[in-house]
Design a protein with these regions (language model features):
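Active-site histidine-anchored catalytic micro-motif
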Residues: 3, 64, 79-92, 111, ...
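Class I SAM-dependent methyltransferase SAM-binding "motif I" and its flanking Rossmann-like core
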Residues: 71, 75-117
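Short acidic/polar capping segments at secondary-structure boundaries
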Residues: 11, 45-48, 73-78, 84, ...
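ATP/nucleoside-binding phosphotransfer catalytic cores, i.e., glycine-rich phosphate-binding loops
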Residues: 118, 122-165
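Short hydrophobic/charged patches on amphipathic alpha-helices used for structural packing
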Residues: 60, 117-118
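Ligand-binding beta-strand-loop-alpha-helix segment within the catalytic cores
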Residues: 2-70
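Short, glycine/charged-enriched secondary-structure capping and boundary segments
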Residues: 19-21, 80-88, 141-145
């Protein structure tokens, strides 16, 4: 049985063009993968606190075991909706808690949901995939910075990195 969970999500309706879940349903959970169980990160769009509680409960199976995590990266060095210069993200980067939290993005849609860095780091395999020269340069210099992506690169010997222009 295959269970799929998102590492992060924009706090938007699942039918929104901004929804990661919508993209996963359309592009991944089909053909041979159509029987996979996809756990949503947006269950209660009208109440963010209740939503976090619901997602924490439904993600307990991933907290126990995650086999594979795919991360992306933004031009600003953010990953998994953990952003530089965001108070909630800073708290997450300084925390050892395992769980699901809210953060704020610098651009719309602002409200995000993410798994903590410790939650992500527990994964058996972590792959970082990104495109573009600007992101490559951010990653290349990440060992000298305090960007969110820096933590994962410095602290995960099992991370595999794939890049294309």
């Amino acid at each position: 049985k295959v269970k799929i969970g998102l590492v992060d999500e924009r706090f938007v309706d699942q039918k929104s063009e901004y929804s990661n879940e919508s993209h996963i349903k359309k592009n991944l959970v089909k053909n041979f993968a159509k029987t996979a169980i996809l756990s949503s990160m947006v269950c209660c769009i009208d109440n963010e606190s209740l939503n976090l509680e619901m997602v924490s409960n439904s993600y307990s199976c991933f907290m126990e075991r995650t086999d594979f995590t795919l991360l992306g990266m933004g031009n600003d060095g953010h990953t998994a909706s953990i952003f530089p210069n965001d108070n909630e993200s800073d708290e997450l980067m300084n925390s050892i808690n395992i769980g699901v939290y809210s953060t704020k993005a610098p651009n719309y849609p602002y409200n995000r949901i993410t798994c903590s860095k410790e939650f992500i780091a527990k994964s058996n395999t972590i792959v970082l995939f990104f495109t573009g020269v600007q992101k490559f340069n951010v990653l290349k210099n990440s060992s000298y910075t305090n960007l969110p992506i820096s933590y994962f690169v410095k602290n995960n010997k099992k991370m595999e990195i794939y890049y294309t222009q």
